[in-house]
Amino acid sequence: MPRIGTPLSPTATRVLLCGSGELGKEVVIELQRLGCEVIAVDRYPNAPAMQVAHRNHVISMLDGAALRAVIEQEKPHYIVPEIEAIATATLVELEAEGYTVIPTARAAQLTMNREGIRRLAAEELGLPTSPYRFADSYEDYAAAVAALGFPCVVKPIMSSSGKGQSLLRGPDDVKKAWDYAQEGGRAGKGRVIVEGFIDFDYEITLLTVRHAGGTTFCAPVGHRQEKGDYQESWQPQPMSAKAIAESERIALAVTGALGGRGLFGVELFIKGDMVWFSEVSPRPHDTGLVTLISQDLSEFALHARAILGLPIPAIRQVGPSASAVILVEGESTQPSFSNLGAALAEPDTALRLFGKPEVKGQRRMGVALARDESIEAARAKALRAAQAVKVEL
């Protein structure tokens, strides 16, 4: 069985997080509950996970030399990517040198961009996906749109939180969607994926955890997106037995191909009993924030256990639950939050304020959580709590 040492001593079990956002913050808390020494790394100071870690470093994680220098200095037992935008070639090298990357360096590399994971799912594993084409130039992109027809979706192959993503309904959308995709990609201008639109009933995240004892699934998480960015999520999403079985089959295939240990967020489109693979994150998923109130072990606790090789004998879902994000728009380096008493006045509600050091434009700064007798009631309660929070910039 795994052994965990004493933090800040020669026996410490050191975990280094690449990325220090709100999801990483919860992972740090869970790792510290299990006695780990945690180092948080990100491109800006005072990031949420840094505020609860033992130490932190500020570097560009796309700079392979800087990333290697920090890892060689800290000598972590586990390297845990929390975001996609990392010098994954360096992670591959470090893994070959004996470091443990969660879940694997290959998983981080394949999921860093939409092309790697789409080709794995559709072409290697033969899983159902939307029809798709990749394009490097405007001419190729226009040809892809013409081939797939309207409506269709365009996304940069490297972006997160819906940045650069558009739904094209007709010819008038073609040029502006291309321009928006070129602005929204993490690596600047470049390659896009054009996908045929699936007329789905709903979309889910199937949180799938690969751990010492095998693979375990959480109850499906339903969610609502705006411009590709999560606004609210709920668990359990009602589904047919056939759709659940097919979702688990697809998630098992994808996570099995990526390998390693840890929690994965597998995104799927559902129509009746039919299921299509969309994307996968080899780490906790933003829509899974609902598990902070909906499960006895949150997605973050599950990730921590899986990383450390600890057993997950069961996951208990505690009833209809929902999350609603607290979005803030404007500019500030010292936002403050009030009316929290009203937000927490109803039973079975909770808040997480992420502690992000600044707002520039629109930013997710917290989440409201709620449980109730039905999904509809839980969603309404979470939205009331989120809307009650007042923000001063």
UniProtKB/Swiss-Prot annotation:
The chemistry this enzyme catalyses reads: N(1)-(5-phospho-beta-D-ribosyl)glycinamide + formate + ATP = N(2)-formyl-N(1)-(5-phospho-beta-D-ribosyl)glycinamide + ADP + phosphate + H(+)
Q: Does the keyword Ligase apply?
A: yes
According to UniProt, this protein's pathway is: Purine metabolism; IMP biosynthesis via de novo pathway; N(2)-formyl-N(1)-(5-phospho-D-ribosyl)glycinamide from N(1)-(5-phospho-D-ribosyl)glycinamide (formate route): step 1/1
Family per record: Belongs to the PurK/PurT family.
Per the UniProt entry, the Enzyme Commission number(s) are 6.3.1.21
Query: What InterPro entries does this protein map onto?
Result: ATP-grasp, ATP-grasp_carboxylate-amine, ATP_grasp_subdomain_1, PreATP-grasp_dom_sf, PurT, PurT/PurK_preATP-grasp, PurT_C
Q: Name one cellular component (GO) term.
A: cytosol
UniProtKB keywords = ATP-binding, Ligase, Magnesium, Metal-binding, Nucleotide-binding, Purine biosynthesis
Q: How does it assemble?
A: Homodimer.
Biological process GO annotation list? 'de novo' IMP biosynthetic process
Binding, ATP: 114, 155, 160-165, 195-198, 203
Q: Does the keyword Nucleotide-binding apply?
A: yes
Binding positions for N(1)-(5-phospho-beta-D-ribosyl)glycinamide? 22-23, 82, 286, 356, 363-364
Please name the top-level EC class of this enzyme.
Answer: ligase
Instruction: Please give the Gene Ontology molecular function terms for this protein.
Output: ATP binding; magnesium ion binding; phosphoribosylglycinamide formyltransferase 2 activity; phosphoribosylglycinamide formyltransferase activity
What is the protein name stated in its UniProt record? Answer: Formate-dependent phosphoribosylglycinamide formyltransferase
* SS bond list: none
